[in-house]
Design a protein with these regions (language model features):
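Conserved P-loop
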Residues: 13-91, 141
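Walker B motif beta-strand of ABC-family P-loop ATPases
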Residues: 94
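Flexible glycine-/small-residue-rich
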Residues: 9, 37, 167
Length: 183
């Protein structure tokens, strides 16, 4: 899957680093990965390709959007199913949380995300996060709770590999190519 990514289109990505990550050593070491960048730059593609390689190597992986994760965990508090539900997110060797900050969180949702990230951090499990937002903006995204945002970032960034993709949108490239072909 990683071989399908056009690194020439996103030259800001370090090829050597990306192929090193595909070796799955980050999973064995419990390292988080944070993909930063504008919409359409390939964050989700890469965040899916790496755990796919990990699953092929025998690890367990799970993919979720940030919105689905916080809704699920926050509702589990209310339902009394927190312990069971959180295992969905803390059990896999690799957890991908896609689009953190695309939609802001209320305080309960911010706390739910903290619970997942903290437990994975304590277990030494790898968490992959994608975000369109700068990390400095996370305090506002977390229901204005800068302390919870700082705690999440503290755990995510400790020993993390941070990949900031600075480049154009794949989707807009495809749109432009289609538009030109139709002329």
């Amino acid at each position: 899957m990683l071989e399908d990514f056009d690194l020439d289109f996103q030259p800001s990505i370090d090829r050597k680093l990306l192929y090193d990550l595909a070796s799955c050593r980050f999973v064995a070491e419990g390292r988080p990965i944070v993909f930063l960048g504008q919409p359409g730059t390939g964050k989700t593609f890469l965040a899916t390709a790496l755990p796919t390689a990990a699953v092929e190597a025998g690890y367990r992986g799970y993919f979720t959007s940030a919105a689905d994760l916080v809704a699920s965990v926050a509702s589990a508090y209310a339902d009394g199913n927190f312990t069971t539900r959180i295992r969905t997110y803390t059990g896999p060797s690799v957890l991908v949380i896609d689009d953190v900050g695309l939609v802001g969180f209320d305080r309960a949702q911010a706390n739910a995300l903290f619970q997942v990230v903290n437990r994975r951090y304590e277990r030494g499990s790898s968490t992959i996060v994608t975000t369109n937002r700068s990390l400095s903006a996370w305090g506002e995204l977390f229901g204005g709770d800068h302390v919870v945002a700082a705690a999440v970032l503290d755990r995510l960034l400790d020993r993390a590999v941070v990949i900031n993709i600075k480049g154009p949108s794949w989707r807009l490239r495809e749109h432009q190519a289609l538009t030109e072909a139709m002329r």
